[in-house]
Amino acid sequence: MLILTRRVGETLIIGDEITVTVLGVKGNQVRIGVNAPKEVSVHREEIYQRIQAEKKK
């Protein structure tokens, strides 16, 4: 796992088309913004797990 440190307003780039920006930090919560092409699914982990569980039914 790659571990990075970013400050509010800083961005990291994944591949050529995906950016992840730190929008804010409040207590133990971090707000991030993700820009990705429409064909790339972006989900919170708990939502992704629910989707995968539904596919198995």
Swiss-Prot record:
UniProt record, GO biological process: mRNA catabolic process; negative regulation of translational initiation; positive regulation of translational initiation; regulation of carbohydrate metabolic process
Pfam (any one): CsrA
MF annotations from Gene Ontology: mRNA 5'-UTR binding
InterPro entries the UniProt entry points to: CsrA, CsrA_sf
Record has Transport as a keyword: no
Major subcellular site: cytoplasm
UniProt-annotated location(s): Cytoplasm
Keywords: Activator, Cytoplasm, Repressor, RNA-binding, Translation regulation
GO cellular component: cytosol
Origin superkingdom: Bacteria
Record's function text: A key translational regulator that binds mRNA to regulate translation initiation and/or mRNA stability. Mediates global changes in gene expression, shifting from rapid growth to stress survival by linking envelope stress, the stringent response and the catabolite repression systems. Usually binds in the 5'-UTR; binding at or near the Shine-Dalgarno sequence prevents ribosome-binding, repressing translation, binding elsewhere in the 5'-UTR can activate translation and/or stabilize the mRNA. Its function is antagonized by small RNA(s).
NCBIfam families: csrA, PRK01712.1
UniProt subunit comment: Homodimer; the beta-strands of each monomer intercalate to form a hydrophobic core, while the alpha-helices form wings that extend away from the core.
Membership in a protein family: Belongs to the CsrA/RsmA family.
Stored PANTHER family: CARBON STORAGE REGULATOR (PTHR34984:SF1)
Protein's UniProt name: Translational regulator CsrA
Originating species: Buchnera aphidicola subsp. Acyrthosiphon pisum (strain APS)
Gene coding for it: csrA
